[in-house]
UniProtKB/Swiss-Prot annotation:
Function: This protein is involved in the repair of mismatches in DNA. It is possible that it carries out the mismatch recognition step. This protein has a weak ATPase activity.
Keywords: ATP-binding, DNA damage, DNA repair, DNA-binding, Nucleotide-binding
Protein name: DNA mismatch repair protein MutS
Residues the entry annotates as binding ATP: 589-596
Protein source organism: Thermus caldophilus
Organism phylogeny: Bacteria, Thermotogati, Deinococcota, Deinococci, Thermales
Length: 817
């Protein structure tokens, strides 16, 4: 259940017992102690006692009081008409909501109106369209045992899957990839304060409690997570659950994209600014298409066959512009068929849902088939379409209880009741005309209210003309209201027929909804096909609009005129080439020249290719990578007590642990978080290790010592820059060979450092360079003068220490011991 504990329910003042309304409230509240109970009273959902105080604080409401003869308690409420907006805010704050509705009309109640909890709402178990985000809305469960068991369920679509992971870092990567709205933790994790604290810092989502099988009874972590997930979801849905076939998935079967890579590449969330890769690609026209595109970005493919099939479909839409525009125009009219099918299977679809199914789904399918041909593979739903056309009015109300849902001529019994109902209605319309004529009262009129029912109303000047058979029911300031025995008889008949019409219309609607529910599998299949069409057309639209090309797959990585798909939207962009094969490519150049952008652009082109998208380049051939690993940009974990350097080393350790010769590795300025000597040593050792592993590695660095590194599969590139009269000019071109210098002082000057500081830095740099050059010359002279055959081992060791001290600019003798 939700982890927001509600505690003591009701407090108040007064000597007497609770009034009946509050007794009913407390009884319902006791059944759902972990939820905030929203209790319908007329046109409002009310809370009382401490719940009222919580509601008022959370939403900024005015706190009032419920007062009876002997009792007073705090009260706060929200109007039912604004429920969706308030509920969304409460769910975002971590509240679970129990919604108690009046389940009988007030006029039919014998005493207190009966109320029941009709909905349990938590962030991860929503099916209501108004409350759901456009993205997938996952509920997750985590358990331990023979590993880390992780299960996901999207209640709104029925997607249900799970995996078994071997490490906590892999668990966090999967959670970051899926971004669940709510997480269930097994008891052994819930009771681990350190784990919970770390988890909350990384994932600000609702943590809820649910019954898990004990570890001893169900040692398999995956089974425990899966079972708890289903039990919790069923409890919130009143036992009804629509779940697609369970899928056991293996993260190793897709391209490995650790959390650090998703963040550094800004796939879903920007590090700065507003743009993301998903934002660039999201030209989808439907909600299921948008969710599918996100899923593709979370799960890039490893196999060439499925990728070529996707690219073929994208290419068709690229080549056939009129077809692409026509399909996208039709897709834009579609409802969220995937979630609508779930509401149908849960028997929660409203009249408007069925109208949307007819008008914004089924009526569009024949038009799509007309454009694409029968090979699109859409199921035949023409029978259901004709049924909905015959049964539903054009624009039905939200609730069937409001009436006017079923079209005239569809159900003979309902038609007969409506005709019978027309007689008493006509009677009251005729009554006003007849009574005006018979009494001579020109202002007489027939009215209705909920207290007195139908009445005859006469204004004060005509009181003397009122016939004796009129029975007074209400006196107002300037008018009186009356009734007649025959009016009451007709009124009772009218109420009886209205109740029969309401009941029959509900029966017909439920049967119609059941007819649609039986097509659930076909509707889900149609939703899947339409979502794929949407993504293919969207990727084609992006490709045409931005000049992307179809990638080829091979052993070499060869990109001609590659561009960064996100940066180029904000500024003029200089395209660059890259060619490598199982090599270590060292990229040097000054800050701000574009090294990091070049690294990111390469990774993004690879990622796009492996979801089946065209890529931002004039030509691209890429290997099928099994993982994309990045160490780009500075970050720290202050809450976890980790420095930038520590976080950097953890990410590098993951690369060394997982990367293979089929991996793409991007490293930017590794080692800069520590001393220069340590940094050079770490960067050199890392470069050697990755070179030995034969990864496709791009290694951006300021350490010019690394340009002397002699490895057989190493090549140097640099980002061009040149000093001109106006200062340093960045060309953003990637050229062969190492950079000639780092231009650090020039960049500092561009950043606005005071002139005297810049001049002092230049002087110090010149002095240090001269000193180092002199030291190196002295080292060389001493080596040339050395006769190694005349050195004892101790003298040789002392000589090496002296050479090292000279190279580092230290006084001789400082390296002893």
């Amino acid at each position: 259940m939700p982890a927001v504990k509600m505690g003591v329910m009701l407090k108040g003042e007064g000597p007497g017992p609770l009034p009946p309304l509050l007794q009913q409230y407390v009884e319902l509240r006791d059944r759902y102690p972990d939820y905030l109970l929203l209790f319908q009273v007329g046109d409002f959902y009310e809370c009382f006692g401490e719940d009222a105080e919580r509601l008022a604080r959370a939403l900024g409401l005015v706190l009032t009081h419920k007062t009876s003869k002997d009792f007073t308690t705090p009260m706060a409420g929200i109007p039912i008409r604004a429920f969706d907006a308030y509920a969304e805010r409460l769910l975002r704050m971590g509240f679970g909501l129990a919604v108690a509705d009046q389940v009988e009309p007030a006029e039919e109640a014998e005493g207190l109106v009966r109320r029941e909890v009709t909905q349990l709402l938590t962030p991860g178990t929503l099916t209501q369209e108004a409350l759901l985000p456009r993205e997938a809305n996952y509920l997750a469960a985590i358990a331990t045992g023979d590993g880390w068991g992780l299960a996901f369920l999207d209640v709104s679509t029925g997607e249900f899957k799970a995996t078994l992971l071997k490490s906590k870092s892999a668990l966090y990567d999967e959670l970051f990839r899926h971004r669940p709205a709510e997480v269930l933790l097994a008891p052994e994790l819930r009771e681990n304060e350190a784990f919970v604290a770390q988890f909350r810092k990384r994932f600000p989502v609702m943590l809820s409690e649910a019954p898990f099988d004990p570890e001893g009874e169900a040692p398999l972590a995956l089974s425990r997570a899966r079972g708890a997930l289903l039990a919790y979801a069923r409890a919130t849905q009143g036992g009804a659950l629509s779940v697609r076939p369970f899928r056991l998935y293996d993260p190793g079967a897709i391209v490995r994209l650790p959390e650090a890579s998703l963040k550094a590449l800004e796939v879903f969330e920007p590090l700065r600014g507003q743009d993301t890769l998903f934002g660039v690609l999201d030209e989808t026209r439907t909600a299921p298409g948008r969710r599918l595109l996100q899923a593709w970005l979370r799960h890039p493919l490893l196999e060439r066959g499925p990728l070529e099939a996707r690219l073929d479909r994208v290419e068709r839409f690229v080549r056939e512009g009129a077809l692409r525009e026509g399909v996208r125009r039709l897709l834009f009219r579609l409802a969220d068929l995937e979630r609508l099918a779930t509401r149908l299977e849960l028997s929660r679809a409203s009249p408007r849902d069925l109208a949307a199914l007819r008008r914004r789904s089924l009526e569009i399918l024949p038009e799509l088939e007309g454009l694409l041909g029968e090979e699109v593979g859409l199921p035949d739903l023409s029978g259901l379409l004709e049924e909905l056309r015959a049964a539903l009015v054009e624009d039905p109300p939200l609730k069937v209880s409001e009436g006017g849902v079923i079209r005239e001529g569809y159900d003979p019994d309902l038609d007969a009741l409506r005709r019978a109902h027309a007689d008493p209605v006509a009677y009251f319309l005729d009554l006003e005309v007849r009574e005006k004529e018979s009494t001579g009262i020109p202002t007489l009129k027939v009215g209705y209210n909920a207290v007195f029912g139908y009445y005859l109303e006469v204004t004060r000047p005509y009181y003397e003309k009122v016939p004796q058979e009129y029975r007074p029911v209400q006196t107002l300031k300037d008018r009186q209201r009356y009734t007649l025995p025959e009016m009451k008889e007709r009124e009772r008949e009218l109420y009886r027929l209205e109740a029969l019409i309401k009941r029959r219309e509900e029966e017909v609607f439920i049967a119609l909804r059941e007819r649609a529910r039986k097509e659930g599998e076909a509707l889900r299949e149609a939703a899947r096909i339409l979502a794929e069409l949407d993504v293919y057309a969207a990727l084609a639209e992006v490709a045409v609009r931005h000049g992307y090309t179809r990638p080829r797959f091979g052993e070499r990585l060869r990109i001609r005129a590659g561009r960064h798909p996100v940066v180029r939207r904000r500024t003029a962009f200089v395209p660059n080439d890259l060619e490598m094969a199982h090599e270590l490519v060292r990229v040097t150049g000054p800050n701000m020249a574009g090294k990091s952008t070049f690294l990111r652009q390469t990774a993004l082109i690879a990622l796009l290719a492996q979801i089946g998208s065209f890529v931002p380049a004039e030509e691209a051939e890429l290997p099928l990578f099994d993982g994309i690993y990045t160490r780009i940009g500075a970050s720290d974990d202050l809450a976890g007590g980790k420095s930038t350097f520590m976080v950097e080393m953890e990410e590098v350790a993951l690369v060394l642990k997982e990367a293979t010769e089929r991996s793409l590795v991007l490293l930017d300025e590794v080692g800069r978080g520590t001393s220069s000597l340590d940094g050079v040593a770490i960067a050199t050792a890392l470069a050697e290790a990755l070179h030995e592993r034969r990864c496709y590695t791009l290694f951006a660095t300021h350490y010019f010592e690394l340009t002397a590194l002699a490895l057989p599969r190493l090549k140097n590139l640099h980002v061009a820059a040149k000093e001109e009269e106006g200062g340093l000019v960045f060309y953003h071109q990637v050229l062969p060979g190492p950079a000639s210098k780092s231009y650090g002082v020039e960049v500092a000057e561009m950043a606005g450092l005071p002139k005297e500081v810049v001049e002092r830095a230049r002087a110090l740099l010149s002095a240090m360079a001269a000193r180092r050059e002199g030291a190196l010359e002295e080292v060389l002279e001493r080596l040339l003068a050395l006769d190694p055959d005349r050195l004892t081992p101790l003298e040789a060791l002392r000589f090496l220490h002296e050479l090292k001290a000279l190279a580092l600019g230290l006084p001789l003798g400082s390296m002893k011991g």
